[in-house]
């Protein structure tokens, strides 16, 4: 209860200071930032599941591009010395989107349109496609692709999940080539209670990786960052299933212990405090434990 009250007050102060000029409360209790002239701006959001926690340091640069660094924490992968801070923690700035190809070309000239928080971080951007900064021979910059990124922790698995939806905004068909990427890191064995840990940052793409999208059509692929110890195996993520599980968890939290007042800012601050207090419960070897 004490943590819930503390989070409630903190989020209320945040909403009061920043919400009027940047974040707008939506009918579904989420908050959304429609990107205008108030950039650059940077912030962070902490989220968690039973076996992973993350701090997403995100923002919009002065040129309208998205900025992201992920801090990922695995509370059950213990490091040495095994004290209260001994969770395996790593930062990642890998750009899975940079490997995507549209008509054999990369995406250029990103302009972030909106950022939404609702227990997930959702970013909607528009891109051009072309040779020189999105143009051929100095042609006009015309948005061709809408890209929606969603970042969220798995509810019950040791991984951070990412969901990418590519939509054709143009009038002509485009060929989209999805990337197969897998990067593996191995920690030093003398730094872990259980020896060396394996970290994997990879895209999640089905058997088909080339798609022809007509006007208004879209395709979705995923990515994940996970870690495991000896005796465990790498997970094969189902990003859509993980997305649904996270959504269901948020809905359950928001529908229980509701706070109603004439002030929508108070109601929203309480709703987000409930998420943070409920999600930071980890499934340790000694049972469920509420993280600090």
Regions flagged by a language model, labelled:
Residues 16-19, 160, 276, 290:
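Generic hydrophobic/packing signal
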Residues 10, 14, 255-258, 264, ...:
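Intrinsic disorder/low-complexity segments
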Residues 1-21:
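Bacterial Sec-dependent N-terminal signal peptides
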Residues 131, 260-292:
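Extended glycan-interaction surfaces of carbohydrate-active proteins
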Residues 3, 149, 246, 274-276:
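Basic side chains
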Residues 19-269:
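Terminal accessory carbohydrate-recognition/targeting modules of carbohydrate-active enzymes
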């Amino acid at each position: 209860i004490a943590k819930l009250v503390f989070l409630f007050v903190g989020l209320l102060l945040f909403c009061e200071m920043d919400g009027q000029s940047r974040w707008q409360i939506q009918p579904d209790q989420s908050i959304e930032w429609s990107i205008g002239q108030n950039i650059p701006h940077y912030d962070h959001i902490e989220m968690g599941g039973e076996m992973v926690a993350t701090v997403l340091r995100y923002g919009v640069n002065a040129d309208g591009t998205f900025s992201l660094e992920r801090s990922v924490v695995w509370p059950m992968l213990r490091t040495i010395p095994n004290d209260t801070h001994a969770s395996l923690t790593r930062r990642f700035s890998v750009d899975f989107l940079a490997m995507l190809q549209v008509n054999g070309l990369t995406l250029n000239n990103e302009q972030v349109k909106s950022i939404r928080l609702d227990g997930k971080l959702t970013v909607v951007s528009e891109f051009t496609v072309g040779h020189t900064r999105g143009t051929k021979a100095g042609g006009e910059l015309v948005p061709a692709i809408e890209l929606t990124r969603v970042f969220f922790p798995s509810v019950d698995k040791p991984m951070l999940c990412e969901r990418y939806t590519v939509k054709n905004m143009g009038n002509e068909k485009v060929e989209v080539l999805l990337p197969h990427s897998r990067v593996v890191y191995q920690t030093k064995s003398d730094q872990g209670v259980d020896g060396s840990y394996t970290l994997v940052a990879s895209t999640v793409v089905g058997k088909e990786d080339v798609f022809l999208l007509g006007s208004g059509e879209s395709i979705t692929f995923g990515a994940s960052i996970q870690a495991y110890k000896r005796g465990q195996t790498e997970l094969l993520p189902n990003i859509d299933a993980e997305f649904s599980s996270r959504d269901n968890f948020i809905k359950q939290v928001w529908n229980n212990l509701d706070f109603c007042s004439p002030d929508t800012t108070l109601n929203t601050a309480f709703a987000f405090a409930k998420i943070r207090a409920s999600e930071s419960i980890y499934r340790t070897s000694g049972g469920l434990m509420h993280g600090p």
